[in-house]
Amino acid sequence: QMAAEKYNLNIKFINVDESFNLDIDHLKSLLSSKTKIVSIVGESNISGMLPDIKEIVAIVKSKSDALFILDGAQLVPHRSVDVQDLGIDFLCVSGHKMLGPTGIGVVWGRKELWDSMDPVYGGGDMIEEVYYDKATWAPVPHKFEAGTPPFVEAIGLGAAVDYLTNISMNEVQQHSDSLREYAKNKLENIDGLNIIHSLSKNAGCTFAMSIEGAHATDVSLMLDTYGVAVRAGHHCVQPFHRKLNLDATFRATGYIYNDCLLYTSDAADEEDSV
């Protein structure tokens, strides 16, 4: 929105269906020769929705010359991602969602695109030659990394990547999928619990929930007394909550450090009865 305001751009949003999957027909109707960028989430951080990325990339490329940006913050920690196979142009990843430290992430992009772009910030280590009247930039990626880098965070993120690689992302994905099925079966049996999830096998292990008559923050605090960590709020998707007529939800996400969500579901059931 800030870029759109600065450069007089028009932003359009893709609808979702009743199962919270992207409406592909609506996407097709939005594309034109004027479309410059298409950006979608690889996995929804609220409904767990997993779009068919390759299909969507093919549709976008057939109808426009737009660059395709994949938000992989929720996807990359849970599943193996092959950027070459997907055919995307850029991939954005958040470090803290994949066992890394806060304050650091990764933006992968095709090299020819990086080479064609100018630096956003100026500072040390991003220059090649400096003269009184001009400067030349260092090769990618250095020209985009001005100043002292967050080397402590980078080392931490590297260790997290090595850790997950040693486990194998296929193993991580299988564990996440098994947690999803277990959690789905448990949560569906709790009366009064509204589950915002596609409830299909083509989804991640992310469950946003609400209980009628109880605020998400209160539920979160109650679950905390059981030692259960969930997040309460709008999870960076206020328009989505507004569409569902919800002020907030509480969200549980299974990961490699979870063995099951039995305690979480039982605690939510007790909170519902309270």
Language-model segments: residues:
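Pyridoxal 5′-phosphate
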Residues: 1-266
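Single conserved hydrophobic/aromatic residue that forms the stacking wall/gate
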Residues: 263, 270-274
